[in-house]
Amino acid sequence: MDRELVMRFLGTGGAVPSKDRSHPGLLVEFSGTKLLIDCGEGTQRRAMEQGVTIHDVDAVLLTHHHVDHVAGLLPLATTVDLLHGRRLKVYGPTAGSESALDISDLEVIEYREVNPGDEVEIGDLRVLVYESEHGVPTVDYRIETPKIPGKADPKYIRRVPPSKRREVLLRGERPYSLTKPGKISVYVKGDGRPADPENVRGCQVLVHEACFEDHEEAVRYLHSTHLEAAEVAREAGVDLLVLTHLSTKVDPERMREEAREVFPVVVVARDGLMVRVRR
């Protein structure tokens, strides 16, 4: 089984894109399974520029239906239909009255509504759904791999019959295992007020929106700041915090330095960033 989950940040901007930051799009890959979280304008082109194929994704996970998160969905679904002759599987919350796209009327999309508390198995990944406060139906996603066996010690594993080795490594028995067994978990925060640290606990990586630097502005528009994201990361005990969905108004370098005063391991995402999470 693969021991690595890869996250590729296709778009890291806010509602207004810039020359450096496009509308949101995050590709998660593990053991042949591909999930695309949100699909803003131009997502296919950005993937091509980064040398990534997304027309073979297993599913798209929408955090909500604002236009900056869904404008690239119909073009991608059309590509999937033309190249593969199938409908694009899309999961997300109820569209609501502010939806930018009436997905239910699109023949090239197979839409499944998810709600907070739901769990979905997609390929080799398990997806848990949590509520986000954003004024419209919005969700966060916790993505987990299956349990990964401990890494074998070649000096000792030969003593175990081949048919028993996986069982031994899944238990993490010493001296046969060099590492403890476990799973990879990442939490992707949809637009909205800060994530609940209890929902994030146990994850290695927290991807959190940081649309604003100013707290009052974040509260007014139901978004989050970099400092609030850092507080969540500290309370949840993650290994890495990645800030994304940045407004054109913010200073990314200042945000990173200020966030590091609260939580030490912070990366401000940029379009093209790749994060590898190993077990």
Swiss-Prot record:
Active site (record annotation): 68
GO MF annotation: an example: zinc ion binding
Keywords: Endonuclease, Hydrolase, Metal-binding, Nuclease, tRNA processing, Zinc
SUPFAM superfamilies, alphabetized: Metallo-hydrolase/oxidoreductase
Keyword Nuclease in record: yes
Assembly description: Homodimer.
Pfam families noted in UniProt: Lactamase_B_2 (PF12706)
EC number(s) recorded for this UniProt protein: 3.1.26.11
Cofactor or coenzyme needed: Zn(2+)
Source domain of life: Archaea
Binding site for Zn(2+) 2: 68-69, 191, 245
Family of the protein in this entry: Belongs to the RNase Z family.
Enzymatic reactions: Endonucleolytic cleavage of RNA, removing extra 3' nucleotides from tRNA precursor, generating 3' termini of tRNAs. A 3'-hydroxy group is left at the tRNA terminus and a 5'-phosphoryl group is left at the trailer molecule
List of residues binding Zn(2+) 1: 64, 66, 134, 191
Native organism: Methanopyrus kandleri (strain AV19 / DSM 6324 / JCM 9639 / NBRC 100938)
Originating gene: rnz
Gene3D superfamilies reported for this sequence: Ribonuclease Z/Hydroxyacylglutathione hydrolase-like (3.60.15.10)
Cofactor note: Binds 2 Zn(2+) ions.
HAMAP family, per database record: RNase_Z_BN (MF_01818)
General function of this protein: Zinc phosphodiesterase, which displays some tRNA 3'-processing endonuclease activity. Probably involved in tRNA maturation, by removing a 3'-trailer from precursor tRNA.
Protein name: Ribonuclease Z
